[in-house]
Amino acid sequence: MHDDSLRALAREIRVAVLTGAKRANVGHIGSALSIADIIAALYGRVLRIERPDDPDRDRFILSKGHAALAVYAALRARGWIDEETLSGYCTDATFAGTHPDHHLPGIDFSTGSLGQGLSFGTGAALAARLQGSGRRVFVLVSDAECNEGSVWESVMFAAHHRLSNLVAIVDANGQQALDHTHRVLDLSPLEARWAAFGWRAHLVDGHDLPELCGALSGDDSSAAPRVVLAQTVFGRGVSFMERAIKWHYMPMNDDEYRQALDQVNH
């Protein structure tokens, strides 16, 4: 997918996030908007995925599961789920819940409890090696999620086993549920911390699609896992949501939805 198509996909994801959240009257909007470009890069170019039932396709795990709506939009764009499933977001009508559900095609692990996705991803990467498969495993975590001790246990495990087929992506938007990450637990500089554990760390603009694609595709020749630290803006694309913590949980009213949709489409 060329750059213009990637930008169109990112816009489609943002529209779906806003529409789905408004229809269900739920929050987690800012978190999903911040990863829209990352998801577009993955599903539009980077991931080697043709069929959901291909045992050797790449795996993607959204560890920050509350942003699942962005992934559902990408799965719909690829034709892996239909519009009816996406429209049933956060209802009893489908498995498209607030957090990813492995009953949906393309969802490899049900997440929601933070800190678990990378643990699963390291196991999946090791399993691929033992099976002689060329599949890669990508895991998207949040910077606030790196407060969890289980993340660093996984980081040590992956480096020890030299899992070069594992790529972690950190959505570094600097915010979490109730405050800024540096105020809750300052982990800066994240790049140096991951590198100290033996990972190849790459710091990128999380909204620059060509830069994202280059870093995510990367070079698998080195026998070490990779981490892409994507500097993003919480609520990206909607001016009144950007860096505004209340949009972690806040649903939109009708006027806010119209304004947000207009900004994303223009």
Predicted regions and their residues:
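Cofactor-binding active-site loop characterized by glycine-rich and histidine/acidic residues
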Residues: 20, 33-160
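Thiamine diphosphate
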Residues: 106, 110-113, 117-220
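N-terminal capping segment at the start of a domain
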Residues: 9-26, 171-173
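Generic beta-sheet signal
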Residues: 58-60, 135-139, 166, 222-232
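Non-catalytic, mobile gating and regulatory segments of ester bond hydrolases
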Residues: 1-5
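Glycine-rich beta-alpha junction loops
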Residues: 66-67, 71, 173-174, 208, ...
